[in-house]
């Protein structure tokens, strides 16, 4: 295992008490929680500060470059928290664009925060007018992604933007067999899912109905003008996906560190006790516990047809 602090491996000089790395497929920055026993009182001499870079490596499992948010010493224990987005991500700003493309927004935000852009399955839509009104860049971009059925994550200096349905349909990276002895929990609230959605603003009302959906309708009034009917319908579809995608979720602790797994990918589940879960599951979050060398998967069943 390596702990690379500002590029230097400090692992030989510290004793690691706890090390969690949470990777999120959407809506939240990856987070590192590191607790060190600083019995040799070396930490203070290294002069750590907010914004420093840190990375954990254990074979194929890597946190990528992360940015220190806080370092708290207490009774010989150093508690460090770091995130995959830089400090600049907190800055709020206001700006407007005309005749702007989706990926133009993504590229501009990535560049502003020193990130490179990667995309998967994205349709580069064009908007007549877009306004960012006193919002942090990633909060603003998240709102736009939700409307388009897209999501993004930040990992190792990259802004990765993807179409959710596209990623859910990709070839699973592995098969996980779940037995009654596994620590597997699940929740199915599919009966409470919305069957259709409306996106409303001014004279336009976008609509979308889920395949085999029920009568329950989601209605959202959007605080901005939509370009045309096709855009309004597309936004209704994105809103319905966002409201329903976590209807069936589960968590699974594994007995080992899943070094090759990452949030935003799919796996195949083969279960002995919960056959309804057999098939593809999307990893919405994964926690790597580097001290106990095990992982916790947060899974959701992909939506069908949208």
Regions found by a protein language model. Give the residues of each.
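Assembly/oligomerization scaffold segments
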Residues: 1-88, 181
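Amphipathic, non-transmembrane alpha-helical segments in extracytoplasmic/periplasmic proteins
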Residues: 34, 94-117, 132-156, 199, ...
């Amino acid at each position: 295992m390596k702990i690379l602090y500002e590029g230097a491996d400090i692992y030989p000089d510290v004793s690691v008490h706890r090390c969690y790395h949470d990777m999120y497929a959407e809506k939240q920055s990856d987070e590192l929680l590191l607790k060190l026993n600083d019995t040799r009182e070396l930490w203070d001499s290294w002069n750590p500060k907010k914004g420093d870079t840190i990375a954990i490596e254990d074979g194929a499992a890597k946190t990528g470059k992360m940015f220190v948010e806080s370092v708290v010493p207490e009774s010989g224990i150093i508690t460090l928290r770091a995130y995959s987005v830089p400090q600049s991500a907190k800055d709020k700003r206001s700006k407007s664009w005309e005749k702007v493309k989706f990926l133009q927004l993504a590229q501009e935000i990535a560049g502003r925060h020193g990130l490179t852009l990667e995309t998967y399955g994205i349709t580069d839509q064009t908007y007549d007018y877009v306004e960012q009104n006193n919002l942090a860049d990633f909060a603003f971009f998240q709102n736009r992604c939700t409307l388009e059925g897209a999501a993004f994550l930040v990992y190792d200096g990259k802004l990765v933007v993807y179409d959710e349905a596209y990623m859910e349909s990709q070839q699973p990276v592995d098969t996980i067999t779940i037995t009654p002895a596994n620590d597997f929990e699940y929740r199915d609230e599919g009966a409470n899912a919305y069957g259709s959605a409306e996106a409303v603003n001014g004279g336009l009302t976008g609509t979308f109905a889920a395949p085999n959906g029920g009568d329950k309708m989601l209605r959202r009034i959007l605080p901005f003008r939509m370009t045309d009917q096709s855009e309004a319908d597309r936004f209704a579809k994105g809103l319905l996906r966002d409201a329903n995608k976590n209807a069936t979720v589960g968590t699974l602790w594994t007995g080992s560190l899943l070094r090759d797994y990452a949030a935003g990918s799919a796996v195949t589940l083969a279960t002995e006790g919960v056959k309804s879960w057999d098939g593809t599951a999307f990893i919405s979050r994964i926690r790597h516990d580097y001290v106990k060398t095990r992982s916790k998967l947060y899974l959701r069943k992909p939506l069908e047809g949208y």
